[in-house]
Amino acid sequence: MDWTRILTNVAGEFFAPTTAAYALAAVGLNIHFGLTGLLNMGQAGFMLLGAYGFAIATIAGWPLWAAVLIAIAAATIFALILGIPTLKLRGDYLAIVTIAAAEIVRLVGRSTALTELTGASSGLRGNQYKDTFQDASPFDDGTWALGPFEYAVNASNSWWIRIVGWVVVGLACWLVWLLIRSPWGRVLKGIREDEDAVRSLGKNVYSYKMQALVLGGVIGSLAGILYVLPRAVQPDSMGRSMTFFIWTILLLGGAATVFGPVLGSIIFWAVLALVKLTLRDVVPTTFLRSEQIEQFGWIIVGVALMLLIIFRPQGILGDKKELAINAH
Amino acid sequence: MPTEPSPAATDARAAVAAALRDVPHVPGAPKPDPVLIADDVRRMFGGVNAVDVDHVEVQRGAITALIGPNGAGKTTFFNLLTGFDKPNSGKWTFDGRSLGGVAAARVARAGMVRTFQLTKALNRMTVMENMRLGATAQPGENLFAALVPAVWRPREKAITEQAEELLARFKLDTKRDDFAGSLSGGQRKLLEMARALMAKPQMIMLDEPMAGVNPALTQSLLGHIQALRDDGMTVLFVEHDMHMVRHISDWVVVMTEGRIVAEGPPDSVMNNPAVIDAYLGAHHDTDLGDDALLDDAVLEQLRTEDEEAR
Amino acid sequence: MRSAVLDPGGTTTPPLARRIAALLLLALTSVTLLLVATPARAQGPVASATAACVADAATGCIVGTLRTEAGEPVVGAVLNVVGPQGELTATSDATGRWSVAVTEPGEYEVTLDVATIPAGEALRDPANNPRTVAVGLGASAAALFPLGAPAAGGGGGDTGDEPSDSPTTGTDGGAAAVPTTPGSTGSGVTAARVAQLTVNGLVFGTLLALASVGLSLIYGTTGLSNFAHGEQVSLGGILAYVGTQLVGLPLIPSAIIAVALGAATGWLQDAGLWKPLRRRGVGMIQQMIVTIGLSMAISYVFQFFFGAGPLRIVTDTPTSVSIGPVRITTTTLWSLAIAAIVLGGVAYFLLGTRAGRATRAVADNPALAAASGISVNGMIRIVWTLGAGLAALGGVLIGLYFGATSWYSGGALLLLMFAAVTLGGLGAAFGALAGSIVIGLVVELSSLWIPTDMRYASALVILILVLLVRPQGILGRATRVG
């Protein structure tokens, strides 16, 4: 077994663009669930919408900044549409509506009726929309190696997307760090605990929940852009499973913490890569086909999610005394 | 010491008593200086009138007790007045402003702050965070201002000072950094009341402040409620235990089956046949208030225990 | 929502850990036994999988067929594929087909090694080699290299005539996993079509009701939104498939065994997982997230053993009968009759029997029910068993109705079940029945106006709209706040 190759690949997952995208999506979900107690089961919908908004605007010839703004606007409108009917209702309604809404985005996006806009189920190819992002890079084209990690500087799965991705993740963490310590974050924490109590103190709970939903959703849409930049916009790869992975990441790292989502994402992808690569090397393909190894990985994720939420709902970084898994 | 009536307290109580002297002891009686006036407030649950109040006024600066047997609709009436439930019909004004159909948060901002029967201390926040949350006019509660600490730090400092004063008054200052969930039931009641006071309300509405509180702390709570009145605040509180009420309230409103059946000063209400009927008729087993329980000797004993407990 | 706060002083209790470990072990053992008992199926694909790639939720395929200008397959041509997964190669087989399995979605650059194509053949569009295709997991993307004389006008016509990537399956997709029902193709609003779609909607709604009534009962008695209920439905279909196709039983005994085993999993789940969690005081939201993890684990276990493709419970073509303008298969008529009888039985159980009334009492007020001498845990056990059994029956009948079942057939319906339950009022069993019929009709009739592949979305839009105007559902009633 080639441990060097396996460990190098696993280490590559630590700072892969996908890891950054999932970390960012989990930061958004953390604002919903960790800070406010909102059960958003449709974070992948925000991501897909952001990805579509960015890609379609870019293909239409819009500059980079405008395409990003379109993604943000799409997520904002989506959050408002979801929040208006549900934020006054019980928490499980929001869960059902967000998961349904994310599914609607995916079903509409993959529908043949919109082929010209969204490319239907085959989606939008990356090189249709990644030029503006790659052109924004200050570096020269080519490849560059750091130790065993060699990637293109600007193209597709590049150093450039890694740098931008992790800078955005860092900024999002800084934002959460500021907000958690602010009076605004205190109101959210109160809402997570008992929204009636906060209402009785004169705070407009509905408005705060809406602000949290929009903010977390916008961060989710940026994560969507990050996620699709090194690949394609594929509606079926951004479905319910993606949301559940983000939840696992958040609960693994620790909800309501600043760095929990980042740590969770790194561990999630590294462990998954380790398990799959090792199995691929150890288990003969006559016993387990390669797709069965993939499926085995996801089975582990499902079981890990169950065990985590039962035995360590505060995750790695969380404080059990402070975390209430409450629905609003 | 809140349980010892101070001269100011006696004055305040006497002044309120004087103001209410000529008010007739009938349901819906008009008050000389009402802060809250409610008309035709009704709330149905599955065809049953949970609340059916024709008219009621609450005197400014007085402690008014809303009493009645279990299921009389007191809490529902409270929920309606504070915007936590919507009536089928009715309107009410608070300090001249109409508050019918206004959302709970805006009712609170209008100066009418409530507490809950089942204490809603925010258990996973510290006592100080609970207190700060009660404050108003904190610019940092705006999402964008929150990002610039310089904008909200000065106000935060003022809020913290105000909170520390209140905590000292409610003898919670030593618990400042403890999680609210670690406090005793009575301390949580005190915290909830102190937190409500952070907003400097005109009127405070307490839903069964004495429920589930041990006798020693009951005395201290009663003292705090009287002190609020002495500071000029209007207090409306729900209670179904009458002997708690008679020692501190200036005026008593009796509800049963959603209606107001009697009003008056405590002593007069206790002897009102409608009240006795309401209690005995509906709930024969309800303790009408065995005053032996709260005679002076017992009170003295409780007070001593209270002292020793500290 | 019932109290869903974590117990701050709660410490991990080893018995629960052991119990869960035991449960997982049990589950794993049973599926392993299943695997051992069915070597033909489980290992069948391996033999043929040397070249052909099967797309599933974790795998994407890049495929193509190479033919000479004369239409003969090109054998032994070598293709290089470079992308997120690194460098891969493929060789075309005797039919000219080649495929590459990727587990990392994204863009891949496919290069045809022109040195390996037969002499005298050339690429029709040399500018298109290498070409880039985007592939997602669960989809196949085609990279076609037409051979022949270079097209006139250079590369002007390289797009349009042949899509560079045309996915064939989308197993993660709800709509794609379920074949189109008879009569729903075609267009235009005609009376006959409306009649056909209405009947389809009623059938689909009735079958959906079998699944959603169980979901609603479980929610009603325990407060739990069970995201793994879809997998209970898939389980029924898959067990029936195992019975008919792998064990060789006739359909009816196989279906009965599937339902019985389905119900048994409900009993086991409550005994081994949910009851210990309730006793431990695990909050409702936590339990809901447990169901999400369970749903993920079970669905991939299905995929692990049975693959991502459709599984046909019966292989013979069903016979159809025509009633006026409406065509319906005899199997569907029987299914409808069975579903109606079973739903009637459930209604009788809830309204007419002591146990059923006790169940409703628990749903209404568990504390009061317990005080009246009803065993709350006993009732919850009955509800889990009943709900899982109903879901399994729904899975069998839905599998028959759509012609095939799959690892995802229940998962695709989960949101429609939630929509039905929410429409009917969360926790109201009869509401779930009414809600299912509405959802069935909405799904089928909406294809009169919107593309068929968006019809599931229409049901979900209805769900959101209903919440906007009547959050307590069609049959639910407003409850006292606070």
Regions found by a protein language model. Give the residues of each.
Chain B
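The feature captures the beta-strand-to-loop junction immediately N-terminal to the Walker
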Residues: 67-69
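Helix-to-loop junction immediately C-terminal to a conserved catalytic motif
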Residues: 82
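A short, surface-exposed alpha-helical micro-motif characterized by mixed small hydrophobic
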Residues: 245-247
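Catalytic Walker B motif of ABC-type/P-loop ATPase nucleotide-binding domains
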Residues: 204-208
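Conserved ABC ATPase "signature" region
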Residues: 143-175, 223-226
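ABC-family P-loop ATPase nucleotide-binding domain
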Residues: 1-42, 284-310
